[in-house]
């Protein structure tokens, strides 16, 4: 049975993923969802293979698919367009596993095509001798036609494919073992990829076909928990448009349980078309607002790049379309929201003048200045955590936030922060994802960056994925600096929430790029309170230098003087 992936079998080094890819194509006629699962597995195995043979790819903290795909060095190597193709495969695989919506041949075929392009890239960069191949869907369509005409040996083939599927469903790739097996190839293949990659011509994302574009957008909606035909409607006819027919067709409208519109989605072919879609979507939103006395949120998307217009902040990019509960929460908060101009800070939590000033600066930034990022630079010991707890208290009472995410890079900082929140804001439900496994529904979530990266793609409930892009209304980043952002920027790009960064690094020593991350002028944080001022105010004491001599520096180390343990 010929497939598009047979060429991979010519090189033994591709064996860890070649057979799974072949199986994904062979089973597409009989079971499209099994084909999608195999496409996802083949992609995961191929990614792990790349990590095992390329010296520029460092193992992330976890070797699951989400972590491997989102590592910054990996994304830089494969490029944006190819990563987006791969993300479609990942998303469809998740939808098969977690969604009630059936995936069909169209989705499976697009997964196969995207997988083919990814594996062709691997062959181009790492093959001994590269031969150009094109994905040929006619091979599959001919097989479909043969199946329709003759069923003589179809039962035997089906039995063979079922056994094959069962075999690959149990197969796993041990990344550490793969690294050890491919150690001898690493230098040679890393060099080959560096030589080959510059001449690789990426296959452009073809979103001109409405059908193809819709598959990408539908997968995004399904992953967010929307149900087609129930709370997600396609091609909704709206009367009252300023055209000859006075009728317009909204590509998608998303509804709540009372069938009130939550969002309107305008799907366009390219990013260039977004401006056209923007005006059209605004007209649709105007009509729906007149009918339901509530203006829906607007999303503009081509399946890869998505923009949101919520009427509160300027139009911005967002990672995905919101889930139903994200949008329902957003409207509930909108109905409770009050101005941040005249706030009252709980002095039992943060009673010092500079803490109150910091909170008011952030509120002014979020409110009057209409910004979504703030950076607080406060000396160690001046009460950054108390300040941010009091800020959360203000924003909760003003109806600006419901769900809060507190991120830190060490378990100890996460534990300390949660303890302080519980003591000072006892009415706020809190959970530490590092320790409290299973308690995911608290309104204030504390986590390391690594743990949250893993939870985004793995935690779900009866309504679908839990940590969707609109789940949190405020993200707090402890010890915010450029290196943290670079390493985990996918978290900040994924969650569409206002961001508050905390750091004790003196404002004139903070990397210029950190200010750029928070969209601030270099050297000008949202609020700063330095050590010198804290000492002057009597809240902190200055450091004292103590001179001392070190034996190692003064006299060096003699091997004969070392203990037996140190000698080893």
Language-model features, listed with the residues they occupy:
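Conserved G/P- and acidic residue-centered "switch" motifs that form tight phosphate/ATP-binding loops
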Residues: 104, 381, 478, 503
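Residues immediately C-terminal
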Residues: 413, 451, 479-483, 490, ...
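Short acidic low-complexity segments
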Residues: 430-438
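A short beta-strand-to-loop transition that corresponds to the Sensor-1 phosphate-sensing loop
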Residues: 302-303, 447-451, 479, 502-506
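Amphipathic alpha-helical interface elements
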Residues: 1-165
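Interdomain helical connector at the RecA1-RecA2 junction of SF1/SF2 helicase-like NTPases
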Residues: 512-568
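SF2 helicase catalytic motif II
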Residues: 463-501
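ATP-dependent helicase/translocase motor core
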Residues: 120-403, 408, 412-428, 440-444, ...
């Amino acid at each position: 049975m010929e497939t598009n992936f047979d060429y991979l079998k010519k090189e033994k080094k591709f064996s860890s993923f070649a057979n799974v890819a072949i199986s994904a194509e062979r089973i597409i006629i009989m079971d499209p969802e099994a084909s999608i699962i195999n496409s996802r597995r083949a992609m995961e195995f191929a990614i792990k293979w790349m990590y095992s043979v390329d010296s520029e790819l460092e193992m992330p903290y976890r070797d699951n698919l989400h972590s491997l795909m989102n590592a910054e060095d990996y994304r830089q190597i494969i490029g944006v367009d190819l990563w987006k193709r791969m993300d479609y495969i990942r998303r469809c695989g998740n939808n098969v596993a977690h969604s009630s919506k059936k995936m069909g041949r169209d989705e499976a075929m697009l997964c196969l095509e995207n997988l083919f392009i990814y594996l062709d890239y691997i062959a181009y960069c790492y093959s001994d001798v590269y031969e150009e191949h094109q994905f040929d869907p006619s091979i599959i369509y001919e097989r479909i036609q043969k199946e329709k005409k003759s069923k003589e040996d179809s039962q035997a083939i089906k039995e063979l494919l079922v056994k094959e599927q069962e075999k690959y469903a149990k197969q796993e790739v041990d990344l550490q073992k793969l690294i050890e097996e491919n150690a001898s190839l690493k230098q040679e293949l890393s060099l080959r990829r560096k030589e080959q990659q510059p001449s690789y011509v990426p296959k452009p994302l073809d979103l001109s076909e409405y059908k193809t574009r819709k598959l990408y957008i539908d997968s995004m909606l399904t992953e967010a928990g929307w149900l087609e035909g129930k709370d997600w409607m396609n091609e909704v006819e709206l009367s009252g448009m300023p055209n000859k027919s006075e009728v317009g067709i909204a590509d998608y409208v998303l509804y709540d349980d009372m069938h009130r519109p939550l969002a309107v989605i305008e799907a366009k072919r390219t990013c260039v078309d977004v401006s056209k879609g923007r005006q059209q979507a605004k007209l649709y939103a105007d009509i729906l607002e007149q009918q339901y006395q509530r203006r829906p949120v607007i999303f503009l998307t081509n399946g890869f790049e998505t923009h949101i217009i919520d009427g509160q902040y300027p139009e911005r990019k967002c990672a995905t379309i919101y889930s139903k509960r994200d949008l329902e929460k957003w409207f509930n908060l909108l109905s409770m929201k009050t101005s941040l101009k005249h706030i009252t800070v709980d002095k039992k939590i943060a009673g010092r003048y500079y803490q109150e000033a910091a909170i008011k600066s952030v509120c002014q930034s979020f409110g009057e200045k209409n910004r979504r990022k703030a950076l607080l630079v406060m000396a160690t010991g001046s009460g950054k955590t108390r300040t941010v707890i009091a800020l959360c208290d203000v924003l909760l009472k003003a109806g600006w936030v419901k769900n809060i995410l507190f991120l830190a890079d060490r378990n100890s900082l996460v534990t300390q922060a949660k303890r302080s929140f519980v003591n000072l804001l006892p009415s706020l439900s809190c959970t530490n994802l590092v320790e409290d496994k299973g308690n995911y529904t608290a309104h204030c979530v504390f986590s390391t960056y690594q743990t949250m990266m893993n939870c985004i793609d793995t935690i779900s409930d009866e309504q679908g994925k839990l940590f969707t892009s609109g789940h949190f209304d405020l993200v707090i980043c402890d010890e915010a600096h450029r290196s943290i952002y670079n390493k985990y920027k996918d978290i900040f790009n994924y969650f569409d929430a206002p961001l508050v960064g905390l750091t004790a690094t003196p404002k004139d020593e903070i990397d210029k790029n950190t200010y750029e991350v928070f969209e601030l002028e270099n050297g000008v944080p949202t609020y700063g309170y330095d050590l010198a001022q804290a000492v002057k105010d009597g809240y902190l004491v200055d450091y004292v230098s103590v001179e001392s001599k070190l034996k190692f520096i003064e006299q060096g180390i003699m091997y004969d003087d070392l203990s037996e343990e140190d000698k080893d």
